[in-house]
From Swiss-Prot:
Keywords assigned by UniProt, alphabetized: Cell inner membrane, Cell membrane, Membrane, Transmembrane, Transmembrane helix
Location(s), subcellular: Cell inner membrane
Lipid bilayer topology: Multi-pass membrane protein
InterPro entries: LrgA/CidA, Uncharacterised_UPF0299
The protein's name: UPF0299 membrane protein KPK_1586
Domain of life: Bacteria
A cellular-component GO term for this protein: plasma membrane
């Protein structure tokens, strides 16, 4: 009985913390003069709490595992909603595909550039050093 209560408590705590970050993000999004989805702000809040080790990862791990396990199922209503507007999407399919492709390439370039900027050039262990004959 005690083990069952402990497991229930762990799942309850995980979902309460995840939803608290979500609703805090929604609240903050309502206060901002620009439009940023509250769920994105909530994820950033959760990330900051975990990165600064204010919240231990094991507190949210059970809830995250459940959400990840059933993530594909959670996208079904979104896909059905998109299919309701298939006529509009079909009329604009070319621009949508082009914008997705261009934005993907931009993300690749920005991530590559920022990674090189942050990490710089490092010596590879076991690789011989190049001699500069100038």
């Amino acid at each position: 009985m005690s083990k069952s209560l402990t497991i229930i408590w762990q799942y309850l705590r995980a979902f309460v913390l995840i939803y608290a970050c979500l609703y805090a993000g929604i609240f903050i999004a309502g206060l901002l003069p620009i439009t940023i989805p509250g769920s994105i702000i909530g994820m950033l809040i959760l990330f900051v709490l975990l990165a600064l080790q204010i919240m231990p990862p094991q507190w949210v791990n059970p809830g995250c595992n459940i959400l990840i396990r059933y993530m594909a199922l959670l996208f079904v209503p979104i896909g059905v909603g998109v299919m309701q507007y298939w006529d509009l999407l079909r009329a604009q399919l070319g621009p949508v595909v082009i914008s997705c492709a261009i934005s993907t390439l931009v993300v690749f370039v920005v991530v590559s550039w920022s990674s090189h900027l942050v990490h710089g050039e490092r010596k590879v262990i076991g690789q011989k050093e190049k001699k500069n004959d100038a």
